[in-house]
Amino acid sequence: MATPEDVRRIALGLPETTEGPDFGFVVDGKAFVWLWRERIEPKSARVPNPDVLAVRIAHESEKETLIEMDPAVFFTEPHYDGYPAILVRLAAIDPALLGKVLTDAWRLRAPRRLNAAFSPDEA
């Protein structure tokens, strides 16, 4: 089980990452992980859900693979159809897997110079 503290520690351990509003993490001005904004009531505003992360992935097709791998951890909703992000249940994900998922997401958004200089052992 991962915690918000694990997310913050892992994300801020990645080079040039900053924390933005609503527990979102950014590199080079690009978000790679943020809190899922859930719609509690139909036609109402979405509100951040502290138990679920939205994490950037390479391609939308990756969603199906992740969901099949572990549907207790990974899921999606219609709001994310056509968008390269997967939803992650914090209570269900192992911190080591969370580290891999966040590092992969960071690599997708980080500029080439950071990717080239980054060693996973640094995180």
Spans of features found by a protein language model:
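Charge-dense, helix-prone N-terminal extensions
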Residues: M1-A123
